[in-house]
Amino acid sequence: MKRTLVVAGLWLASALALAAPVAVKGYNHVKSVGAIDEYTLQSNGLQVLLMPEHSTPTLTFMVTYRVGSRNEVTGTTGATHLLEHLMFKGSKNHTREKGNNVDQLLERTGAKYNATTFLDRTNYYENLGSEHLATVVGMEADRMRNLLLREEDRKPEMTVVRNEFERGENSPIQALYKEIYQSAFVAHPYHHSTIGHRSDIEKVSIAKLREFYDTFYWPNNATVTIIGDFEPAQALELVKKSFGAYPHSPKPIPEMYTEEPEQTGARRVIVKRPGQLGVVAVAHKVPAATHADFAAVQLMSAILTDGKNSRMYKAITNKNLSTGVEGDLGIFHDPSLHMVFAPLAPGAKHEEVEAIILAEIERLKKDGVTEAELQAAAAKVAADAAFKLDGSFGIAGNLNEYISAGDWTLFYGLDEAAKKVTVADIQRVAQTYLTENSSTTGWFVPTQPGAGGAAKPAKAGHQAERAGGPFYYRDPQHSHGSVGVDLASAKEPGGSGGAAGAKMAPNVRRSTVAGIDLMAYPTGVKDVVTLRASLPAGRAQAGAGNPSIPVLTSMLLDQGTKSQDKFAIAEKLESVGASISFRAGTDVLDITARMLKKDIPLVLGLIAEQLRTPALSAEEFAKAQKQLAGGIKRSLESTDFRASDAFGRAVYPQGHPNRPVAPDDMLAAIESAKLDDVKAFHADHYGPSNMKMVVVGDVDVAALQAEVGRVFADWKGGKAVARAAQSAPAVGATTQDVAMPGKTSVSVVLGQPSGLRYSDSDYQALRLATAILGSGFTGRLMANVRDKEGLTYGVGAGLGNDMFNDGDWRITATFAPALLDKGIASTQRQLTLWYDAGVTPAEISARKSNLIGGFKVDLATTGGLANTLLAAVNRGYGPAWLDEYPAKVQALSDEQVNAAIKKYLKPQSMVVVRAGSLPAAQ
């Protein structure tokens, strides 16, 4: 029998001071927990959650429906997700024909918006300027009960969702995850994936979807959440005006009552597909998120799999048997699974890794955990409690999971419950849930290594991941909202505490400290601090030398220093819930850190120590070689990677920093790399010269400057970023094929060198024109190739790789093999029309509103602001650029925008790359 977690009452009295309930006619105030007030609309039972937070002029509006794939049966699997897609196709008062459908309405505001479907829920959200609250309330209310649900919309959207299904099937890990759930659950509907079975996706009728809509989309089965800059009384009136027009559902919402019978023996699944490296996963059934044991299960999972001091890292990853063990534990309404995923390193055996995972689980059950392990896991929970309050969008996203689990107060309650977990609790839940009889073990076994070499010219006649997660209306990994990432989406100063339109640059405290260009931006967020930094030690800095050396050097930074080993460093970070990461990009070493205010000295000291005096030991060097080789081999399983990789080599000449090294060549370079080369690269390229550091959040500027000066004192050295001559488009179009048998979706890249850096005078004009072609659902590509023709889940166009050197212009898309030629032809048809006829004044005006209107959204978190400020200075602008950007976009003339298309692009000379199971290869 399920036990309910009851912790809110223990601390409710102290939390009430944070809440500010208001009395509005027509509502019942239910309770206040933490900073959140819960109301019920009396007329129809709609639940409303409000959390005012005025540090930035943005808000997030979200509607969560308590219907997910757990409410589906055989024959209708995937219906919840397909219905989610159709929720964007028009409602009574919001249609494409009227020029105000969801995409047209929201993209004009610059909103971030999407929808997700998962096991227990479907949710729709908008993150936008607070002045647009009335707009989104009216739109969301309209589609709650006035959806058009037309057959002419279902047909093309079915093939869109089918391509989304096919894309997921391309991933061995996602396929294994799906098979494990199908084996672990035989009765409960968690058995089937949220995306559904292919035949159900293809055959579900519009009548069945209408029945689903009329059963579950009612106010009494929904929660409206508003987080951010708004006045509660006004917001409640807006919600009542729009959502209050609908009655309570005419029938009770059907209850999903199926319970999974007790499992009486271990289960196994094996997935065999083309791929590079194997995977081992071990899953056990665990209780629902509302169960009293769940907080202990979360901490147990962290002790097993989270960080360098986790049990699985030490037993598997640290012994070169995996490229990185991960744990998977969702926040679900019903009992689900805890999984340990171990992608195998080259040469590792499934049997050996599985045996180690099981042995570590048994050791945990037999011997328990130490107090130090528990305190480190609890510290992460405490820090995450602060981090999840960094921006309205993150708060709403976290809250959504607890709403769907059945108790939104778990947003606070699980954090409180974690404080009370003991080492005895950890051992008890391990013994209770990590049993052999409740386990399902899965292997992914690659049947062939797949093609790993360079792309081959196409034959004549052919024209031009978390494993388990929700399914989205639009791919969250694909930028639809802006083109030219980083600075392109710079917004008003999130967290500055100023009013909309306030200048950003005066809030940036810029100074040179110990040779480092240091920028600090204090915001209104409490406790949270994000650090972003860079120095010229990226992959391009290898020059004509071994291309793996910069990457291997970056990988060794967090593997111990001359003063302490990696486990001691990890223990210090984990004890306060902080994190530091290093990554060698194309041009620079990227440094990211997140911490609480009190831990700034600790984190800065560790960053300085890791940059200045890494151990660079032979033992860790050998491990890094194997890890890097394993990562490259695993990337060869991705059609997206293979297409982008081949495209990069096709458009950039030898010696250009942006030209990728062929995978086979990089694997050979890793094997031949020498530790002495790493030491020489570190000595030559690491130093404060050209290093930039941005710190944003709850920061004392003077104290920060003093601490940076102390920990980096007397550090010398460093290099400038590698520069290159401009690339030139090829003469004559070419098509390159990368054959990857067994893939159900083909990735396509079409484009050319742009010849532009972000700082060039024509860049913004071409960027705006490109956004009209390929950004968002109002972009021509998505509006036609996806929405009208239903040929793809995702297609877009953008500029990129242009921070320090000239970059490229590209269109990316995915198509089913059977629709490949038709999809490419449709894409090229839109490209030709855009190039020949140009863009209209109306399109230019709307896209300017999108870019400028979205200015105040992306910087509403410390991370977003830090990323954007660092990108600005790396591109040669001062912080003032963030204030100047809207005016520069607004000043672009129609003539400039259209002239940029013709000046820089040559569709007749573009490269097309196709990667996947190609018709010619079948």
Residue ranges, per PLM feature:
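Histidine-acidic residue clusters that define the catalytic metal-binding segment
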Residues: 22-39, 103, 138, 164, ...
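Positively charged n-region of N-terminal signal peptides that target proteins for export
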Residues: 1-4
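Short, conserved secondary-structure transition motifs
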Residues: 162-168, 258-271, 379-388, 595, ...
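Proteolytic maturation boundary segments
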Residues: 17-49, 231-272, 314, 413-534, ...
